């Protein structure tokens, strides 16, 4: 009988022998190589089976089963506590202790620090439907010369901790687990892993899919400086690195939190304990590019071997990546329905708090605050007795909190601390509880005030009142195909990871303004700061842009990261990415749009705030000049924006940063990202801006991409063939086209009643554009990405189907629009056949030009 086996033993990869965690660890040796997995021995389930095979234990377990079946949780909890204590204090028979001690002694040649981690590995752990996140016990930094057997008993006993028993019982109620407590004992209930400790410089977790949306194209890595416990505890914010797996693993980029990690966890050899110390490394991204790539490669390899989405833990020591755990991702692996939560109206109030969204749901409820799990349970039960499911607010959670972290008891949870992989995030995600972490000052929310927790848009937002929302469920099955492409409008990378799973043919509009704002800098300011050099930056800049030596490089990197995440999320479908379309009043709000030049005898320096001395030499004999990069315009809507800005000497160099980011995206083989130029007024602008785009791609030895023009200015609609010489297609911006056709300021409240995208003049402009674009050879595509298709009814959609190649709508309208368009196309096909496919008759009946009638026939019947 094998009571203890080596990690490389063939039986170690059998879950019935070494439990969920243990078997996965053994499989990793074959997948990533033994040099990348810390050595371990495993106390098998046969050990636990033999240990627990006594009359008193078996009788108690049988009684536990009975009380759970009866619903007598109070007595069941008492029995579980007695079982835990009994097992922890058991005497281990010699036939069990002897092989254990021998194997522990053999570990000394592998654990050069003479310390091990003793981890529980339950036979029901790491199932495809349940994670048991952090519920079993783990003991770190256990000296090999100590009584390791004591920790083995503690791990086995943790199988009867109440939170574990309660969780197993909950899974049985949901029919996700069909084994009784008594049968678990017969199977051995628990294996124990004894693994060499890694004193990591950096550590983290990786998911082979996006853990919040289930997007399978994009994987996510989160890492912290020091030991990995810090990331699970959620005490510090962690950057997240996105990677794409196919055709080969490629790192897309890293998004750094606004308040990067300040404290790290290390092992103190003097005290024998882990202690927190300040982070000294000047790398807010934590992992080097090579390390991130290796983690991405390992994660991809592990997912392929398991043939399912995976969640792994890793540690980096002296530049070497070690994989320490792997388990199936339990939330999205078997999902058959995509659930979309959406506020019914845009809030007219600002959120009182923001943070990191976990999942994509919305919750409403009264606030209850608690700092420990005992108080949380009391508060939640008080509300439950009133028939209320509150929103629980705390600093952070641990496994003890799980008795209340259930949708039957709470509507949502808000934590001041944590990250996407902390305990609260993992459990909330698995149980479908709306959750926000890293919410500053959340505990200042008033007790019992009703709030709305909105996680639907990629960022967690908390509003201090009840907002109405709706839930749309989309079955992930085949929907009807349409000839007119249904596309979706996107605002941010996080939103794209969710929305890309809708049945669209791609994205009609990716607004990069969200990404630009997230860079935290005006691009012209970034270029100016780089020309002066990092040494000439004032302290306020060095603090704001900590760890960054070049602002323009950082600007490009952040744009590249955001765009590439969106492009990867939609692969292989195209996304149309609009270059930044901020107006002057919006650009003026970016950091650096207002800055200061400090002129000193030693040279010029630069600052975000007024200075009374030279930041470089300290001299007080300085001249501090206020610099404004943007100017005030009476009507920014008609001002310095779009193509006019890009080709201007005032902004051309900054526009080249956007182009550089675009080429970096294409270098990642993400050629499905198609550039779009907004607000093109004249053919002269069209010529200049397309030359800039082509030149940048040619200099990067890349294929010149398709180029799309926004059709917003009537000049494009009046002379479409002239503009078509410079682009490959058009996308109608219905808001601006209506504004400029009807001469109505789209922001005017007084004239709002006259603002109508279906006005005959606007429709005529669209008809002219389509006739010209479709007469070109090769044909220029025409789509729409404005607000109109999402807001107007079936008649306007029919007009668009007749004339356009694609229709872009907001995410909540994708399925509805797809079904309406399919119905319209079928009706039009029948109508055209009734007209004997006579373009003159079709033109007359539909009141459209013969050219547009010919296009409609070609489109619906695929004729040449």
Predicted feature locations:
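ATP-dependent carboxylate/acyl-activation modules
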Residues: 126-128, 138, 151, 157-162, ...
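Terminal amphipathic helices with adjacent charged low-complexity linkers/tails
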Residues: 41-64, 266-267, 271-273, 304-347, ...
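Conserved phosphate/anionic-ligand binding catalytic regions in large, soluble enzymes, centered on
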Residues: 16-50, 116-148, 197-240, 310-333, ...
